[in-house]
Amino acid sequence: MEKKILQFAVIAFVFFAQSSFAQELYMPRNIKKAYAEGTRSKDGKPGKNYWQNHGKYNMEIAVDPKTKLVSGTETIIYENNSKDTLRNLVIRFVNNLHKPSSPRGGSVSDDFLSEGLTITSLKIENEVYKEDAKNWGTVGNVKLKKPILPHSKAVLNIQWNYPLSKESGREGQIDETTFFVAYSYPRVSVFDDYNGWDRLPHTDRQEFYNDFNDYVFSVKAPKNYVVYATGDLLNPDEVLQPEFAARLKKSYTTDEILHIANEQEMKSGIVTKQYDWNVWKFEAKNISDVTFGLSDHYLWDASSVVVDKKTNRRASVQAAYNVTGTDFVNSVKNNQYALDWFSNN
């Protein structure tokens, strides 16, 4: 009798366990809500009601090689495409990673540290905001005086500055006259359909989650500095001497690798226009970020490659590198191959 009872208990346990495992897997409530509202679908595709917010950024940025200070002004037209009323704006400035008080995923040297972002002026819909960005980490919160209603826009005007870090890792001072200027502007953080505002700090141990925005921006740099940036250079004739502007334009139409500026030409100071400062203008659309570098002695190569054989559309391929960086001599060639393969296979 006891044996039969034991057998029954084992069978009952197995049946109960199978029934338990057959239940629906755990799903966070915000994901369930997104499925229910049709912004996401279980096949991984955007739902029928999917949306993203969007920004149009118009920026004027200047880099002073003497003071190592980056300064800028920007106008952001921010589109709230959600059904939510936004009562706060979350501003992201990744370069505040260099502040001593910011959390980081590892130890850093003293040369990595800097004072971080200073906002000298902030207006939202022409309302003045007194925000002390010195209290921000890589993410700051602005409580709005007037909320941004669903399917409406808000205009932000920001003036800011920050020092380039002496230690070059992801960005900063590469040498005394070469700088990689990344994460250089305050931006509106992502507001999405299942997490709301992205308030997670950047700790130098992850990549980035950004809206896809449109950018028109300029970089002001001293004469003899070449600026290399995301997007299309809009004014080569205004910043380059005619011979070098012609070389760059030719590179847009050929598979041939051209030396836009070699070592001797950069040393001779004959590449850029000889105003005290040149303003380099760029445009990039539907992209998650923009960045730029500048140098008064880096070599500059360029070519292009067909990335759409139906329309014959070409993409520019460029490289800027120190004369000692012999591995980069083949950079344009290698990137031509990569772009061609991924575009046509």
Predicted feature locations:
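Hydrophobic helix-coil surface modules that form long, contiguous segments used
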Residues: 192, 207-345
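N-terminal, polar/Ser/Thr-rich
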Residues: 22-71
